């Protein structure tokens, strides 16, 4: 089968960069002194029997982070960043993720085999420990997975003389594997990052520093007698089967190679069902990167893989791969600043890269990547191992690694309410994604702008929008809650108290109502908006001018407006989920407190500098505005934004206390009388709501409530209620909501938590 020169035949407009990617990252858990953590795998990470994203490798303290399939290298790194964030915040706060491939100083007896449920997996790890030793098992790395794009493969297939797609793909991936092993030394030279081993790691003295112990025969490799041919797929499959039959290997996965064929459960299935993708297993962790691999490395490797396809396959495969192994060993164990040996043929690599970039018209970015490769070939100072040299102290990188680990740990806990890499999404959705990853529920973002997610476990699929809009609420329930008039009628029919008032569809109608309310405390609000938009509250009778302004503000948000009686008391938000109150929040209206020096405008700016405050529901607290509503509120109190408040003087900028309009959040779940929680849950149930925010005005929360004597008034029901404000509060312990959403949607996962 002719596979050589196929890329050269493709049209320049062919989708040469089309591919799917996945990353697996191993990392040890250590304490703040850089010693191995002896705690079990975190129970909050769910059952390892099915977790798709966070597993343990050989050791109980060796985490393995696995991304979903991504359509770009950028997306793969984004996935890995989020999973790393979840892992970093799921382990103990006193634990860190070790950023090096080589472990800290360890003793063999410290290493505990992963405590897995699967009996074979436990037996397999004990077997490996006995055969290869335990310390080698603590070496960690990155596995880079790539599947050539469907359209790219089809274009290559059309240029070939083949009629069998499976056979063609097998030949294509076999050629790529052959050339990858032939030129494996390129990866070791450019990206090797294991220059030293900590004291007593090896039983014998070894010269150091080197480029990569992990990628040499000092790393985790098979016994020398295990020699598997890549000359053909049949040879590969048969050789491994023979070693297993003879007892030299216990399982197919015990054959360790820098590249592994993937996509089938057993190797022999590759012959008739085909190779789906390749796993490249020889990447050291890059300690300069929080997630262990940089964007430029991901893209450079992608370009190199295409160059390996551009190059012809070796004529004598076994001989070429043996030479490639010997060269890789020499380069791996050479000093990081030692130039490449003469037998390292860099010219054919750089020529292939140049021709590839030129043929397909790749732009400045990829041309820059090629230049970086050329620069590194010419000067080893540009390699990763060389960059680590200044950080080696007394033949150790332990201090450097611990410093990096602490830095990355602190980053994980900075803005800990957000999911790293997904900060532009709505905050409740970020929190739900965090919990989904933590619990081991598969996720796909169907529409990032619309906050629309697909979640699944095995065959069970759920769709979630905006964090808590699910199939559990029928279509009409959010529509009813969006219409405040309908909400009031349903609650009234169910016997629950609501404010008296009327509805208007024009400014003229609203103004005509003024004589009836001119001496009353009132609330003016849009009929069908959420998040406190367009609401004005008058605790003192409103002038006609101010009343008109309030109507105009409300009509700017909706075509219909409600004017209701103002109910005195304290407003609380009750979060109801599936008929149960899960959280109660006291919300304090947007405010500033004077210091006798700064204007109200300056005080607002100071308060907005709080890192918990942001915009568009992506932070636990919202930025405080100084718009029409706030300035009207100031006018009613006799102030302007440029007035200086006396020290200790508190001024509210809003009557309504919504967090979404700059208010502060106080969690009172534990102190709120259960009777009010039950009453709020009953109100949500009367609407048929699964997830619902119930706003109650309570004059005296020390008086127990009942349906007959509620001692409160429901001023609003909210569909798609915010969840973040209950979890990350200005005061109080906070209540986790998103995890309970997932437990309700996937009870089978909740019951499998470790």
Spans of features found by a protein language model:
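A long amphipathic alpha-helix within ATP-dependent nucleotide-binding catalytic cores
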Residues: 247-259, 301-304, 308, 553, ...
């Amino acid at each position: 089968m002719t596979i050589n020169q196929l890329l050269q035949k493709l049209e320049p407009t062919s989708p040469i960069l089309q591919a799917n990617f996945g990353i697996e990252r191993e990392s040890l858990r250590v304490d703040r002194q850089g010693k191995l953590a002896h705690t079990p795998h975190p129970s909050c990470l769910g059952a390892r029997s099915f977790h798709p994203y966070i597993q343990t490798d050989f050791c109980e303290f060796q985490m393995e982070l696995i991304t979903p399939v991504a359509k770009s290298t950028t997306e793969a790194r984004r996935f890995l960043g989020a999973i790393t964030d979840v892992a970093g915040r799921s382990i103990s706060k006193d634990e860190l993720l070790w950023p090096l491939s080589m472990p800290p100083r360890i003793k063999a007896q410290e290493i505990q085999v992963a405590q897995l449920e699967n009996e074979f997996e436990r037996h397999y790890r004990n077997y490996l420990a006995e055969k290869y030793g335990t310390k080698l098992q603590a070496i960690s790395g990155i596995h880079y997975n790539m599947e050539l794009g469907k359209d790219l493969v089809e274009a290559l297939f059309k240029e070939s003389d083949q009629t069998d797609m499976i056979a063609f793909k097998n030949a294509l991936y076999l050629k790529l594997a052959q050339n990858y092993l032939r030129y494996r030394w390129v990866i070791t030279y450019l990206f090797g990052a294991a220059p030293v081993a900590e004291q007593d790691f090896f039983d014998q003295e070894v010269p150091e520093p080197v480029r990569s112990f992990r990628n040499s025969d000092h790393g985790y490799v098979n016994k020398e007698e295990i020699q598997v041919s890549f000359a053909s797929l049949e040879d590969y499959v048969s050789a491994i089967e023979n070693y297993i039959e003879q007892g030299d290997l216990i399982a197919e996965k015990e054959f360790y190679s820098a590249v592994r064929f993937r996509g089938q459960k057993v190797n022999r299935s590759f012959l008739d069902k085909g190779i789906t993708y390749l796993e490249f297993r020889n990447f050291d962790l890059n300690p300069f990167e929080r997630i262990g691999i940089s964007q430029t490395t991901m893209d450079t490797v992608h370009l190199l893989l295409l160059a390996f396809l551009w190059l012809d396959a070796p004529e004598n495969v076994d001989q070429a791969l043996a030479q490639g192994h010997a060269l890789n060993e020499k380069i791996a164990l050479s000093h990081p600043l030692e130039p490449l040996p003469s037998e390292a043929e860099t010219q054919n690599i750089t020529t292939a890269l140049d021709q590839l970039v030129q043929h397909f018209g790749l732009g400045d970015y990829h041309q820059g990547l090629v230049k970086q490769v050329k620069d590194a070939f010419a000067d080893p100072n540009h390699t990763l191992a060389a960059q680590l040299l200044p950080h080696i102290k007394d033949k150790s990188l332990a201090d450097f690694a611990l410093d990096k680990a602490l830095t990355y740990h602190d980053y994980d806990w900075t803005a800990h309410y957000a999911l790293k890499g997904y900060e532009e999404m709505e905050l409740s959705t970020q929190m739900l994604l965090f919990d989904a990853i933590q619990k081991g529920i598969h996720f796909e973002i169907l529409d990032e702008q619309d906050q629309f997610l697909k979640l699944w476990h095995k065959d069970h699929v759920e769709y979630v929008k905006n964090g808590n809009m699910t199939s559990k609420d029928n279509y009409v329930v959010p529509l009813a809650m969006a219409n405040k008039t309908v909400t009031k009628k349903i609650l009234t029919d169910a016997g629950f108290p609501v404010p008296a008032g009327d509805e208007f569809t024009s400014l003229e109608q609203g103004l005509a109502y003024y004589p009836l309310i001119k001496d009353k405390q009132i609330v003016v609000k849009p009929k069908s908006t959420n998040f406190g938009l367009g609401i004005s509250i008058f605790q003192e009778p409103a002038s006609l001018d101010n009343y008109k302004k309030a109507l105009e503000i409300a009509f700017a948000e909706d075509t219909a407006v409600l004017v209701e009686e103002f109910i005195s008391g304290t407003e609380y938000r009750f979060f109801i989920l599936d008929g149960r109150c899960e959280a109660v929040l006291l919300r304090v209206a947007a405010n500033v407190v004077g210091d006798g020096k700064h204007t109200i405008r300056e005080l607002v700016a100071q308060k907005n500098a709080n890192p918990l405050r942001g915009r568009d529901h992506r932070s636990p607290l919202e930025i405080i505005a100084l718009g029409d509503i706030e300035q009207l509120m100031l006018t009613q109190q006799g102030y302007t934004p440029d007035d200086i408040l006396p020290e200790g003087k508190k001024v509210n900028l809003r009557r309504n206390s919504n967090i979404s309009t700059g208010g502060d959040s106080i969690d009172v779940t534990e102190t709120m009388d259960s009777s009010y929680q039950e009453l709020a849950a009953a109100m949500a149930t009367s609407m048929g709501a699964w997830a619902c925010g119930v706003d109650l005005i309570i004059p005296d929360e020390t008086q127990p409530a009942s349906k007959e004597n509620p001692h409160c008034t429901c001023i609003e029901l909210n569909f798609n209620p915010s969840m973040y404000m209950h979890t990350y509060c200005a005061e109080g312990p906070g209540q986790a909501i998103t995890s309970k959403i997932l437990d309700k949607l996937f009870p089978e996962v909740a019951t499998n938590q470790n």
